[in-house]
Amino acid sequence: HKAIRRQRQMCIRDRLWPEGKVPNYDNIAKFVNAGIRGVRAVDKDVPVMLHLDNGGNNALYREWFDEFTKRGEDFQIIGLSYYPFWHGTLDMLTDNMNDIAERYGKDLIVAEVSMGYTMEDYKDYEKLSDEERKGYATKQELVEKIEYPMTVQGQYDFMEDFLNRISHIKGNRGKGFFYWEPAWIPVPGSGWATEASLKYMNDKGPCGNEWANQALFDYQGNVLPTWNLIRDFKPEE
């Protein structure tokens, strides 16, 4: 869940920064290597994925993984986050994936991806006041930069193109993706954090859902065509 993930990220930042913040790669490697060794101690056969955000930023990936591979334990998978409203074009994602697939010889997984299907407000579904709501993550100024319209068809077309792109990464290194978050529709009580999480992070609540227009179900819970696309997808030759 997003609340758990965000809480974990904040704990990591609080405890590892500034010692573990870029460009302190010696320290970063020590922290990450300790985590890898912990995984190996439990099960030496578990694949390890190192996951960065901003999947269209090749310079970021080259710098981080160049520095880590000089110092790091072995890992099997590079994970990327890619949201078209934050991380550039599909061309940028594809170019980055092809480059790092060859450069590091690792399998790749897009560990986070989504595309909106509407800009219809969902305030009435959440039943929260304006002060309590988070609102959209996809602000209008971000939507205007996307190559695809934020419509049901736009979501479908984006995901079809995305799936074909990651299916043709050099060396067959593109191994899959995780859609974030397909079933997070705007019903009352479906905010991103529990009361305990909000208290821990000193954040106001209940905050609501800022991601509902990215789901694979509409606001009433009806499945969207993109769900069937993903289920039945076969890459273009």
What role is predicted for each listed range?
Residues V32-K44, T69, M97-E102, S167:
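Surface-exposed amphipathic alpha-helices with a cationic face
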Residues H1-I12:
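Single conserved hydrophobic/aromatic residue that forms the stacking wall/gate
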Residues G20-P23, D95, D99-E102, T118-D161, ...:
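Aromatic-rich peripheral "rim/lid" segments of glycoside hydrolase catalytic domains that contact
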Residues L50-L52, Y61-S129, K134-A137:
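Aromatic- and acid-rich polysaccharide-binding/catalytic face
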Residues N58-T69, M159-R165:
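Short, acidic/polar
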Residues P23-N33, T69, G79, P225:
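Acidic, His- and aromatic-enriched active-site or binding-groove loops in soluble protein domains
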Residues R13-P23, P47-D53, G79:
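Active-site-proximal beta-alpha loop/turn segments in soluble metabolic enzymes
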Residues R5-R6, Y25-N58, W64:
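Active-site cradle of extracellular carbohydrate-active enzymes
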